[in-house]
Amino acid sequence: MQLFWTPASPFTRKVVIAAKELGLWQRIDVKPTTWPLDWGYATVPFTAGLAAANPVARIPTLITDDGVALGDSTLICQHLNSLATDTRVIPTDGGQWPMGALYAVADGLLEAQVAMRAEMLRPDAIRSAGFLQKQQDRIRRCFDHIEEHAVELSVPGGSLPNLAQITAGIACGYQDWRDWLADFRPGRPALSNWYGEFSQRPAMRETEPSDTPEA
C-alpha cells in the first residue's frame, strides 16, 4: 500500500494511528507531499501522482494493494480495519453505531479545526472574522459534546482504541499544537484527564504533528 500524507494533517494522523494500532503500518509505503501556504484558498502545485490517483487532490490518499485509490480518511480506516485479523478499530458486533455517532462529532471537530487553519492562512484583507467565529463555535460545541460522552472514551485494558477515541485524541492534540486555538481543557475535566493518559499511547507519541514542507 502507498499513502500520500503530510505530518500536519489530523486526518492523515488518524490513518497512521489506525494502521499502527492494527499492526499494519509496516505494510504502507509513505509518500510525503508538499503544500504551499496558500493551499487553503488557491490551486497549488500537487505532489507528483497525487491528483492522478485522487482527482480531489486531498490527503490522505491510500493506494491499496489492488491499486484502488481511497481518498478519504474514514474510507481508508475502514479498509485497514477490514485487513485486520483479530482486533478492530471499528466494531463489527453492532457497537459500530454508538461509536460512529461519537466519531462523527470528533471528525467534524477536525474539519472545523482545519477550516480555521485554512482561513488563518488567507491574507488579512480577505480573511473572514465571521467564518472563524463559526468554526470556533463548532469546535466548542463538539468538545462539550465529547466531554458529556467521556465515558465512551475509556479504552479497556488489552483492547485497541476505536476510531472515535482515536479521532477525539487527535482533535485534542491538534488543539494543543496550533497556538491560536483555545485550550480545550477548562470546564472539561473528564476529557482533560482522559487525554492526558491517551496521549501517551505509543501510536500517539509517534505521530505528533509537525509543519508540512512548502516545497
Provide a role label for each language-model segment:
Residues 106-196:
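GST-like fold's C-terminal all-alpha helical module
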Residues 183-215:
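Long hydrophobic alpha-helical segments typical of transmembrane helices together
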Residues 77, 81, 100-103, 143, ...:
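Non-transmembrane alpha-helical segments in soluble domains
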Residues 84, 150-153, 202:
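A general structural signal marking secondary-structure boundaries and capping sites
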Residues 87-92, 155-159, 184, 205-210:
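Short, hydrophobic secondary-structure boundary micro-motifs
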Residues 1-129:
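GST-like domain detector, emphasizing the conserved glutathione-binding G-site
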